[in-house]
Amino acid sequence: MALLELRDVTRRFGDFTAVDCVNLSIEAGELFTLLGPSGCGKTTLLRMIAGFDVPDSGQILLDGQDIANTPPEKRPIHTVFQSYALFPHMTVADNVAFPLKMSGKTPAEIKKRVEKALEEVQLSRFTHRFPHELSGGQKQRVAFARGLINRPRLLLMDEPLGALDAKLREDMQRELISLQKEVGITFVFVTHSQDEALALSQRIAVMNQGQVEQIGEPSVIYSHPANRFIADFIGKINLMAARVTQVSDNDMTLEIDQLGTTTLPLKQGIKTGDQGVMAIRPEQVSVHALARHAELPHAHTGKVLDFLYVGDVTTYIVELDCGIRVEALLANSSPGRARFFEVGDPVIVSWTREAAQFLMN
């Protein structure tokens, strides 16, 4: 049985449907992420799980019991917010101890559990400090410790790393993964950051316009997006308008605007006449000097319009002779990458048959 299960959960605000008939299940001990653009309904969904909002219809089951109308204080769930929500007049220890004091625990038990919680988040030396004496990352760890102190069945996190700088955010991602493995509590993480979701999650639910578009492991979401929206939202991708002109037992032929025809492995459910896009990730596009044209599959000539060097990789924008622009991501440590292509250089771009996929609009 899943720890948390949502069945046909819907929430409306007047004529606007914020969450539209969402179904998903989350297993015990899982680090699960709700990912989507601003306004997609992910925070509204989190608020209903926490008990801060009530669905208009549907069920929210925790350990098989419907808690959709249970007050938040009666749920074994804690929420960590981006703003930390620490009490400025309390020390770190008092902030972490607050839930225990409210539930009437003895001073001895409170002391023991606070020490354990601060040890888990590596803040044992900061017991007597106040929030204004802490860095952003330290404040976030205090919020995590307070969220875990009562050992909830579920820890909800609403974009908790959004206020941190990029380097600290990466460090906190690693700490979160380690912490979740150590305590074994189910984490549900809400974010609009694709990189964050891919780095943190065991599974991701991608939301758009109040609905769940796809649920899966990060590698599946990235490599095999269910549709054009997910492909375009998760990472960078080249999209070329295409139409299916022929389907055989194992292959499908696409007519690509300006580029011509190409043959790809057949996807289940695709039929002749379907409209969509051919999608290729930039890291799956190769850039070569013109001399290699004859030996390359799916090769097209063009010229370099621009490039962006960022240390370990270089992104090239190549305009093909047919007018289509293609983005390629090349590792600077690759063999033969001793020189970079310059703007205006004539080049060949190519990709393998397996790198491209057809996605419905």
From Swiss-Prot:
GO molecular function, one term: ABC-type polyamine transporter activity
InterPro entries: AAA+_ATPase (IPR003593), ABC_SmlMolc_Importer (IPR050093), ABC_transporter-like_ATP-bd (IPR003439), ABC_transporter-like_CS (IPR017871), Mo/tungstate-bd_C_term_dom (IPR008995), P-loop_NTPase (IPR027417), PotA-like (IPR005893), Transp-assoc_OB_typ2 (IPR013611)
Pfam families assigned to the protein according to its UniProt record, in alphabetical order: ABC_tran, TOBE_2
Keyword Transcription appears in the UniProt entry: no
Cellular compartments per GO CC: ATP-binding cassette (ABC) transporter complex
UniProt membrane topology term: Peripheral membrane protein
Cited function: Part of the ABC transporter complex PotABCD involved in spermidine/putrescine import. Responsible for energy coupling to the transport system.
Name of the protein described by the UniProt record: Spermidine/putrescine import ATP-binding protein PotA
Lineage: Bacteria, Pseudomonadati, Pseudomonadota, Betaproteobacteria, Nitrosomonadales
Gene: potA
